[in-house]
Amino acid sequence: MVTVTVDKNENLEKALKRFKRMIEKEAIIREWKRREYYEKPSTIRVKKEKAFKRKQAKKVRKLKQKTNR
């Protein structure tokens, strides 16, 4: 659980920014969005395979660019 204590002299907007940073650091929003809707295991597997292929293609493109220089 993320908690932020606001001091008497502290600006509220500064505390809000600190809160947002803490949430991003703990990846709460990302996890919430991931679990918002049920995904079948097969759908998850297909997404992971597509992401892997995209990353591999990107690595190949970068490698080709380096060798062409």
From Swiss-Prot:
InterPro entries: Ribosomal_bS21, Ribosomal_bS21_CS, Ribosomal_bS21_sf. It comes from the Bacteria. GO terms for cellular component: ribonucleoprotein complex; ribosome. Pfam families: Ribosomal_S21. Keywords: Ribonucleoprotein, Ribosomal protein. Residues 50-69 are annotated as: Disordered. GO terms for biological process: translation. One of its GO terms (molecular function) is structural constituent of ribosome. HAMAP family: Ribosomal_bS21. Belongs to the bacterial ribosomal protein bS21 family. This is Small ribosomal subunit protein bS21. It comes from Borreliella burgdorferi (strain ATCC 35210 / DSM 4680 / CIP 102532 / B31) (Borrelia burgdorferi).
